[in-house]
């Protein structure tokens, strides 16, 4: 029984002492700037929406009304060179079981969502 108590205590100690901090910018990340001119949110995350560039924005802001450039890459459905790098056929081959009915995330991983997310970097 004491082995289990030790294991439980040790696990609790590790979980409390090893905190996963993944902030990307600002005071939370040693005053690092976001790549591509993205805004750094109050909480230390990079992005282009008002959540990142609005009140509390730490760096690369334009006064809280949006961002001053960088990031995302346009709308209009034009994915530019990304579709040349990773065409839909490659995406389908990499994630060929993503629409398996046994999976909980059926339909979640789409090519368009992937391209949209990739354009943010």
Curated annotation (Swiss-Prot):
SUPFAM superfamilies: Lysozyme-like (SSF53955), Plant lectins/antimicrobial peptides (SSF57016)
Enzymatic class: hydrolase
Electron transport is among the record's keywords: no
Xref: InterPro entries: Chitin-bd_1, Chitin-binding_1_CS, Endochitinase-like_sf, Glyco_hydro_19_cat, Lysozyme-like_dom_sf
Span list, region Catalytic: 78-121
Family listed: Belongs to the glycosyl hydrolase 19 family. Chitinase class I subfamily.
Protein name, entry field: Acidic endochitinase WIN6.2C
Protein species of origin: Populus trichocarpa (Western balsam poplar)
Organism lineage string: Eukaryota, Viridiplantae, Streptophyta, Embryophyta, Tracheophyta
């Amino acid at each position: 029984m004491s082995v289990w108590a030790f294991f439980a205590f040790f696990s609790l100690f590790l979980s409390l002492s090893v905190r996963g901090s993944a902030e990307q910018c600002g005071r939370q990340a040693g005053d690092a700037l976001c790549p591509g001119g993205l805004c750094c949110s109050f909480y230390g995350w990079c992005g282009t929406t008002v959540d990142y560039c609005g009140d509390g924005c730490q760096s690369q802001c334009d006064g809280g009304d949006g961002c001053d450039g960088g990031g995302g890459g346009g709308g209009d459905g034009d994915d530019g060179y990304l579709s040349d790098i990773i065409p839909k056929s490659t995406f389908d081959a990499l994630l060929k079981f993503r629409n398996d009915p046994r999976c909980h995330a059926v339909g979640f991983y789409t090519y368009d969502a992937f391209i949209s997310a990739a354009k943010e970097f």
